[in-house]
Structures are given as structure tokens and as C-alpha cells.
Amino acid sequence: MKKNLMLIFGGVSFEHEISCKSAYSIYLALLDLNKYNIYPVYIDKCTGIWYLLDSVSDPPKLIDIDVLPIVSLLPGIGIFSNNKNLDIDVVFPVVHGRTGEDGAIQGVLKVMDIPCIGAGIIGSAISSNKYFCKLLLKSFNIPLVPFIGFRQYDYFLDKEEVKRNVREALGYPVIVKPAVLGSSIGINVAYSENQIEFFIEEALKYDLTILIEKFIEAREIECSIIGNEKIKIFSPGEVIVQDFIFYDYDAKYSVIPGNSIIFNIPAQLETNQLLSIKEYAFLVYKNLELRGMARVDFFVEKKSGKIYLNEINTIPGFTDISMFAKMCSHDGLQFKDLVDNLINYAFQSYINRKKRINFED
């Protein structure tokens, strides 16, 4: 008997369109598997209302939300649409960024007592905030590019103090980032103190916490991981950016691969570099209690060869140009089998969680 799978995508996020593209790739894989009854749920970008669709398309069709059935969640009872309980067995959230990758949707599904693909609340929340994640990773002795962080309140309380901290702790150039945002949105490189104020205030349009890192000339290496207690780390890949300062949003989604962007899988690394990257990826995955999947990104400094952890993505992209699935495929795990494995990991994780003692015991 087929399981009922809900594929959630869209979301109130700057990464809404990327989520829709990722969902389409997964939807095709689910159709190919022919093992699940698929319930596509689209989250409206403006209102955050959940709607039940018949299918997923690419590019997304103009969705007339006025005629779509709304999805309602009733904790302890079920997920409903058109007054019918959908009896969902597992949820695949493909909502990138805010409310999708930050533990929010994972928390909702935990309250609903429904298995959810990917990391849980804690792993998602920590990984999504680049600043707090780096503070924690320091305690695991993971190498990081020098950084500082601050809240909007502190910045407007004393801008000169913040700029002095940047100058003394990091020097220039630096890279300015919103702490909670993906796909390199809102990120800029400041080469002098004359630019830093503008770029900080630009980043504050996206988040209340800002991360500033020393900018280094580096290779960008990515590493795919899947599994729960027993994990598999795939051969890392490299993103070579030719006409951009770094792998920003335009480079990721506005450029045809092969022109200005080259994907090398596997990345050409020294043996010691490869072993270090896999070791750090393993430590991050285990210490942050990640589950199901993650893509862990690294810098390899061009001058010294030193390795630094960049960031962790608990819901990596699944578009046709996304590295996560490409790295898995290179090592022999085809896309539809990857999707099937991720679903099985969600069931395993759910079963393990239910084994714990509760108040009834």
C-alpha cells in the first residue's frame, strides 16, 4: 500500500522561486518511484497560506489561489483539505530559507506528530543562523574564517564602535552577510571603511543579525552528506566562479553552468585536504545532530591551502543545477534513489524518537 507523502514548497521567503524549482525535481522523482501518493502543498509567498495542488510544474504555472483548497493543520487530529483528513504519513519540506530551514516548519510537524524529512528543530535552527552556528562550531575546533557579529540595535546604538571592531578584528576586505538567509542573498564585499556602512544597512534589510567575515581568496568546496546515525559522505565538488567575486545569487541562478560557472566533481584536492574536509563535515553533522541530509560548504584558501568551514545547508537545493544531488550521483546514488533514501531516513528517525519514554510510561 502506498504511503501518503506531502511535498511542501514555496514559502514566505526570498528563496521562494528556488524552492518551487527544487520541488519540481523532487516531484518528478516521486512520480518515477511510483511508491507514494503525492500531495503537493504550495505556501503562498505573500500570505503564507497553504494550498493543495494537483501537481507541480516548472516553470510554476500562474497559481490561482482563489480556486485552490486551503490546507489546515489540526494538532492531534490531522492535516485537512476540503474537510477531508489527508492521512499524511511523511512530509518532504522543500521550503528554503525563513520558516522552512530554520526549524519553524520542523516544529510544526513535530507538534503534528508526522515524520519530516531532514534535520529536526535544533539542527535546523542552529544551522540557519550563520553567526550563532559559527559561535558554536568554534567550541568543536572547526576552522573558521575570522568573523564578528552583531544585532541591529547594537549597530545603530554605536556605528563607530562596530566599524572600529571590523577594522581591528578583521581588516579589509570583508564580506557582509545577513545571518539568516540562504542563496547568498544580501551578501556584499566591502573593500574599505567607506563601503562598510552601506553594506551593513543593506544586509539589515534582510535580517536583524549581521555576520561579517574576513574576505579571503578561496576555492569553494561543497560536500553532500546523508543518513541519521550511520552517515555517508560523498566526494566533495568544487564550484569555480570565473566572472564573479564569489558564488553569489546571480552566479547561482542567473548564469548558465559552463559559461561563467564550472562544477568539478570530484574536486581536485590533496589527500590531506580531502580527509580534513570529510572529517570536519562528519563532526559538524554529528555535533549539530543533523539528520537525513545536509550540504556542508568549505573554503580552501588559494594561497595557503588552509581549509575553513563556510556554512551548512539542511535543505539544500534540488534544482537541475544544484550540487547536492550531483555529488551523490557522481558516487552512484541516482536522484530518485536519493529521494527514496531520504524518505526512509525520516521514518527511521521518527521511529527512534517514538521509542523514548513519555509521560504515559
From Swiss-Prot:
Subcellular location: Cytoplasm
GO BP: cell wall organization; peptidoglycan biosynthetic process; regulation of cell shape
UniProt-listed Enzyme Commission number(s): 6.3.2.4
Cofactor details (free text): Binds 2 magnesium or manganese ions per subunit.
The keyword Ribonucleoprotein appears for this protein: no
Positions bound to Mg(2+) 2: E311, N313
Catalytic activity: 2 D-alanine + ATP = D-alanyl-D-alanine + ADP + phosphate + H(+)
GO function terms (MF aspect): ATP binding; D-alanine-D-alanine ligase activity; metal ion binding
Pathway the protein takes part in: Cell wall biogenesis; peptidoglycan biosynthesis
Gene Ontology terms: cellular component: cytosol
Enzyme class: ligase
Segments forming domain ATP-grasp: 134-344
Function: Cell wall formation.
PANTHER family: D-ALANINE--D-ALANINE LIGASE, D-ALANINE--D-ALANINE LIGASE A
Family label: Belongs to the D-alanine--D-alanine ligase family.
The protein, known as: D-alanine--D-alanine ligase
Organism: Borrelia garinii subsp. bavariensis (strain ATCC BAA-2496 / DSM 23469 / PBi)
Gene name as annotated: ddl
